[in-house]
């Protein structure tokens, strides 16, 4: 007997009680099975730039593979991770590199940073990657 999972993704962003602007960037594509949120680090330069780079790099890197039909839920023997999780790991590392390079090239962005949390749904598996204190919740039941 096989169960069919229903995927519902929601996001909420709020600048909080201290900040005057929001440094969050969110990307969600339920059909492709991906959700990415990055929260620029408040108090640092260009947090919104860092969060934008992170979400763009991860989503743009993941989407072609998610839409390719490649079986990303298979387990990689060497790492024990799914192919989707390995791809997500690579894209988060690429985002980090992109943020670092942008900070080096633009003095106004020196020291910028962001948290990131991403979920990729492949078959009956979900892979979650995160750096920092942004959260992803799994809710079940009614």
Residue spans of the language-model regions?
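PP2C/PPM-type serine/threonine phosphatase catalytic domain
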Residues: 1-142
């Amino acid at each position: 007997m096989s169960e069919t999972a229903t995927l519902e993704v929601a996001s909420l962003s709020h600048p909080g009680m201290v900040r005057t602007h929001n440094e969050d960037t969110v990307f969600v594509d339920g059909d492709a099975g991906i959700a990415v949120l990055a929260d620029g680090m408040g108090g640092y330069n260009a947090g919104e730039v860092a969060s934008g780079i992170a979400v763009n790099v991860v989503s743009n890197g993941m989407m072609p593979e998610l839409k390719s039909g490649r079986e990303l839920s298979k387990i990689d023997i060497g790492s024990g991770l799914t192919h989707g999780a390995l791809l997500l790991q690579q894209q988060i590392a690429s985002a980090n590199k992109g943020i670092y390079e942008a900070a080096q090239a633009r003095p106004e962005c020196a020291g910028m940073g962001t948290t990131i949390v991403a979920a990729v749904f492949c078959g009956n598996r979900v892979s979650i990657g995160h750096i920092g204190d942004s959260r992803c919740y799994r809710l079940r039941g009614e």
